[in-house]
Amino acid sequence: MSNDYYEILGVSHDASADEIKKAYRRKAMKLHPDVAGPGSEEEFKKVQEAYEILQDPQKRAVFDRGGDPNARMGGFGEGGFSSAGFDFTNLVDAMFGGSSPFGSGGGRGPRSRTRRGQDALVRMRLSLAEAVFGVTKSLEVDTAVVCPKCQGKGAQSGSEPVTCDTCQGRGEVITVQRSFLGDIRTSQPCPTCHGYGTVIPDPCQECSGEGRVRTTRTINVKIPAGVADGNRIHLDSRGEVGPGGGPAGDLYIEMTVSPHDVFTRHGDDLEMVVTIPMTAAALGTKVPMHTLEADREDFAEDTKTVTVEVPAGTQSGTRIVVSERGVPRLRRNGRGDLGVTFIVQTPTKLDSHQKDLLRQLAEAREETNASASVEKSGGRGMFSRIKEAFGG
């Protein structure tokens, strides 16, 4: 290294005091003998000397004029390098995030035995009618609850947690080692109290000192009308009780809706398929049918059926909409619709009399085999046309 203190620290001659300090930190951390090895001691001394001169305005002015700033102040001599008015502990603080092992330092302190519990997730199976119209159901939930014997304290009746003799309540043990830099202090959680700062000499036999036990409890859950498969209900503070009888987490109940034999759900609409005979489709008819309300014994009888008017000439795939007989809109007013798709059933077995009647009908309508017409695809595939015919 040269004797130019600015060059030693790697700063310009007009560097500010803050720039000089930062440069010294970088150099000192890189060249300190405990980091770079004993061979760097001489270079480290020069860095210390450069910082001592340049951080002092009077010494820096003497050096800038070409004088010897150590002529009156004295140099390092044989006593090793000085601190130059800068605590090396601060350098280590920068590396250890403010938890320096040098000097006294502040520890983490004991951790609390009482902590918030985890959230819990359970699943509830519903029928389609329960999901659509809402229901109140009981549900068994397996979670941790506050120990009924010690009420969360973790200690037997008449016993209390006492200060840990090993760490004196600090929750950590500190070891001190002598080094070239001075005392190096390191801390770790106390092995006796596991960082709590207290020990339970007579733990509760019911919970083994945990302050909580697992149990299966039954809760009543009100399911709002209109929930869908996968929806969740959030219940505050009904989840797992925390260690030490701490506050309970939240409980989430996820809905699983079973399929229905007749109805399917599409958003807020219900869909069903009804088969009618060929004659009814041709002549028109009125079809009474059960609605989803029929699955609920607690509903009025007049809500359980609806009559749908089928117009004459109805074709297979015709869909008729019954307004406001679908799913109640969740957290909104109104209901979706009920869509009824009709399938026209063609008879497969006819006696001779029935065949004669159909022949007479065909003759009256002048229908023959040549009356069949080919539907134009319009660029659509066969499956697309079939799907459209059934309201897809």
Swiss-Prot record:
InterPro entries: DnaJ (IPR012724), DnaJ_C (IPR002939), DnaJ_domain (IPR001623), DnaJ_domain_CS (IPR018253), HSP40/DnaJ_pept-bd (IPR008971), HSP_DnaJ_Cys-rich_dom (IPR001305), HSP_DnaJ_Cys-rich_dom_sf (IPR036410), J_dom_sf (IPR036869)
Disulfide bond sites: none
SMART domains: DnaJ
J domain location: 4-67
Domain of life: Bacteria
Compartments (UniProt record): Cytoplasm
Keywords: Chaperone, Cytoplasm, DNA replication, Metal-binding, Repeat, Stress response, Zinc, Zinc-finger
Disordered: region residues: 367-392
Free-text remark on how the cofactor is bound: Binds 2 Zn(2+) ions per monomer.
CXXCXGXG motif repeat residues: 147-154, 164-171, 190-197, 204-211
Cofactor dependency: Zn(2+)
Described purpose of this protein according to its UniProt entry: Participates actively in the response to hyperosmotic and heat shock by preventing the aggregation of stress-denatured proteins and by disaggregating proteins, also in an autonomous, DnaK-independent fashion. Unfolded proteins bind initially to DnaJ; upon interaction with the DnaJ-bound protein, DnaK hydrolyzes its bound ATP, resulting in the formation of a stable complex. GrpE releases ADP from DnaK; ATP binding to DnaK triggers the release of the substrate protein, thus completing the reaction cycle.
Subunit text: Homodimer.
Listed PANTHER family: CHAPERONE PROTEIN DNAJ (PTHR43096:SF48), DNAJ HOMOLOG 1, MITOCHONDRIAL-RELATED (PTHR43096)
The protein's name: Chaperone protein DnaJ 1
Organism of this sequence: Cutibacterium acnes (strain DSM 16379 / KPA171202) (Propionibacterium acnes)
